UniProtKB/Swiss-Prot annotation:
Subcellular location: Cytoplasm; Vacuole
Higher taxonomy: Eukaryota, Fungi, Dikarya, Ascomycota, Saccharomycotina
GO MF assignments: glycogenin glucosyltransferase activity; metal ion binding
Biased composition (Polar residues): 400-419, 462-485, 492-503
Residues annotated for Mn(2+) binding in this entry: 120, 122, 247
Gene from which this protein is expressed: GLG1
Biological function: Self-glucosylating initiator of glycogen synthesis. It catalyzes the formation of a short alpha (1,4)-glucosyl chain covalently attached via a glucose 1-O-tyrosyl linkage to internal tyrosine residues and these chains act as primers for the elongation reaction catalyzed by glycogen synthase. Capable of transferring glucosyl residues to unbound acceptors such as free oligoglucans or oligoglucan derivatives.
Protein name (Swiss-Prot/TrEMBL): Glycogenin-1
Annotated EC: 2.4.1.186
The keyword ATP-binding appears for this protein: no
Listed SUPFAM superfamilies: Nucleotide-diphospho-sugar transferases
Gene source species: Saccharomyces cerevisiae (strain YJM789)
Chain residues that bind UDP: 10, 16, 95, 120, 122, 247, 250, 253
Length: 616
């Protein structure tokens, strides 16, 4: 063993001052426990500007009481140029404060010691077994460095724990190497590996003749935590009794604000806090400053002036003035670390629904129409679909011919109960015009129906005459009074909108021609009953007319004046008048659904949240 041995650490930022306090306290405790208090010195390397301009007198006194030797050093020559050159690689680590760690090359200038064990200020020796490194590296040379493999890349060593031999020549060559080359990681660990580690030589010829050597030591002398998934839990549990030293790597240290609030603490984190509490108690520090609040934020500039403790009362004005300045800096650091309060005034405004979209939504999905319908209408409609019972005679009493004063598809639309009184009055005033148009067009319409019925009579299944008679008798409607043109005529939901038929002759029955589109849908009506109720009903009406045979027409002729045969015979007399009346094209029931109850049947198929925007 060498005569002059030292355990050294480095302080290049005031943010690491709590770590320097805890490390020095723990090392002294373990040296005393091992009985080597006088054999191994403790040394602190600190930059001159930090010690003289930043630290308070109390901090200086505490450091001098912990470490037997404090060495003030200056930054490396051309350090600013080196930092600028290594900035790109250093950005990969997202640790800008490590740019000042290049001063670690000054360790080889400690020629007053024969061998040095270097420990980062964020390390914590757990027991005195870590002192065995001096025995393991007792034959170390100046060209060797003893270190532990880095968990992120095991072919490289971690520079947080190193055994080295101070040497002036090695220090000079190393510092020149730092100036001339770019560090792998932009910091001290990369450049020291490039200088001492043969694994970093990409040239095989140079690697074989490499003059320096990395001596790999056991991982138990530098267990880095947290390892963020790299750590093997079984191995950690197995080698736990053999661990000599813990290294708190990463941005968040045990003394940082983030770690104190958010970090998932483990037993080693708790051990560091216990050591710091012992340090505080031994030096009788105020409880209010026992846990310095150091910012976790990355710094791109020189570290600010911060002290972790308040000075005791003193009569020296210069000391009090310095302490006040440092306290102000601590308050600023607290404000920087405070979480910002969310401002409700700047909360993002809700995205309003465009007006066009609102109109589109209310046009296609009219829920008021569905809610205003009587309940019995929907029940009766469902019953009709189930039993397929449609009364042709009663439907004819409620159908109106197309004319220029009516809207398309009004013959098959359910009139809303909320119609304005003005519309009723206007409809009554147009009755005379409507009656004339209907009388003139009856003969042509019934001729079309008769032709369609005769062509399809052979392929259609005729219904039972008895059942038809009963259905007709049960559903026959009564002639409404002139004062109520809007009154419901039958139970099949088919009404005449705003047109009174009280002036029609008893022997004339209006009827509407059949459109080709209805015949097309009738062929494929299976499965469409629920979605196309109006079309289905109109087809059923026309088909029922096709089912009548000659005997059925004769039987119904004597029972009522509103039968289909009587209407046909009466309308055929008006052929001459009908030729003078222009034929109006029937609406396309495939698309003219706005005035029908089509939406009231299909709207329930859409869930409430089908649209992306919510209409307020």
């Amino acid at each position: 063993m060498y005569k002059k041995l030292a355990i050294a650490t480095l302080l290049y930022s005031a943010d690491y001052l709590p770590g320097v306090f805890a490390l020095g306290h723990q090392v002294n405790k373990l040296l005393e426990e091992a009985g080597k208090k006088g054999d191994i010195e403790t040394c602190l390397i600190v930059t001159t500007s930090l010690f003289n301009d930043t630290l308070s007198e109390l901090a200086k006194n505490l450091l001098q009481s912990i470490y037997t030797k404090i060495v003030l050093v200056e930054p490396l020559d051309c350090q600013e140029e080196s930092i600028q050159k290594n900035s790109e690689n250093l950005a990969l680590l997202e640790r800008p404060e490590l740019s000042f760690a290049l001063i670690k090359a000054r360790l080889w200038e400690l020629t007053q010691f024969e061998q040095v064990l270097y420990l980062d200020s964020d390390t914590l020796p757990l027991n005195k077994e870590f002192l065995k490194l001096f025995d393991i590296m007792s034959k170390q040379t100046t060209s060797q460095v003893g270190a532990i493999a880095d968990i992120g890349w095991p072919d490289m060593f971690n520079s947080g724990v190193m055994m080295l031999i101070p040497d002036t020549d090695t220090a000079s060559v190393l510092q020149n190497y730092i100036i001339e080359n770019t560090s792998i990681d932009g910091s001290d660990q990369g450049i020291l590996n490039q200088f001492f580690n043969q694994n970093c030589c990409t040239d095989e010829l140079v690697k074989d003749s490499f003059s320096r050597e990395w001596v790999q030591l056991s991982f138990t002398y530098n267990v880095t935590i947290p390892n963020l998934g790299y750590q093997s839990s079984p191995a950690m549990n197995y080698f736990k009794p053999s661990i000599k030293l813990i290294h708190f790597i990463g941005k968040h240290k045990p003394w940082s604000l983030w770690s104190q609030k958010n970090f998932i603490k483990n037993e080693y984190h708790d051990q560091w806090n216990e050591v710091y509490e012992e340090f505080k108690e031994e030096h009788q520090l105020n409880n209010e400053v026992s846990k310095p609040k150091i910012s976790d934020s990355d710094k791109t500039e020189t570290p600010e002036t911060i002290t972790p403790v308040d000075a005791p009362p003193s009569n020296e004005p210069t000391t009090n003035q310095e302490i006040d300045t440092i306290s102000t800096v601590e308050e600023n650091v607290d404000n920087q670390n405070a979480e910002p309060v969310p401002n409700s005034d700047h909360s993002p405004a809700p995205n309003p629904v465009p007006l066009d979209f609102t109109k589109w939504l209310t046009t296609f999905i009219n829920k008021d129409h569905l809610t205003n319908q009587p309940v019995n209408e929907s029940r009766e409609y469902s019953k009709e679909n189930d039993n397929n019972i449609i009364n042709s005679s009663s439907n004819r009493d409620q159908e109106s011919p197309p004319n220029s004063t009516q809207e398309p598809n009004s013959s098959y639309s359910v009139v809303s109960t909320q119609a304005d009184s003005d519309e009723h009055q206007n409809a009554e005033e147009e009755d005379s015009t409507t009656d004339n148009a209907s009388n003139s067009g009856e003969e042509s319409h019934l001729d079309d129906i008769s032709t369609a019925a005769s062509s399809n009579n052979n392929v259609s299944n005729q219904p039972d005459n008895k059942n038809f008679s009963n259905s007709k008798e049960n559903n026959i409607s009564v002639e409404p009074s002139p004062s109520n043109p809007e009154q419901k005529r039958s139970t099949d939901n088919i009404q005449k909108p705003s047109v009174s038929t009280n002036d029609l002759p008893d022997d004339v029955e209006p009827h509407t021609s059949v459109d080709d589109n209805i015949q097309y849908l009738e062929k494929d009506k299976e499965g469409y009953e629920e979605f196309l109720p109006d079309v289905y009903e109109s087809n059923a009406i026309d088909n029922e007319e096709e089912f009548f045979d000659d005997d059925a027409r004769d039987a119904t002729e004597g029972e009522t004046k509103t039968s289909a045969v009587a209407d046909k015979q009466e309308d055929m007399k008006l052929t001459a008048e009908e030729t003078n009346q222009p034929q109006q094209e029937m609406p396309n029931f495939k698309f003219d659904w706005e005035d029908s109850d089509y939406l009231s049947k299909v709207e329930r198929c859409f869930p409430d949240d089908i649209f992306e925007y919510a209409v307020e």
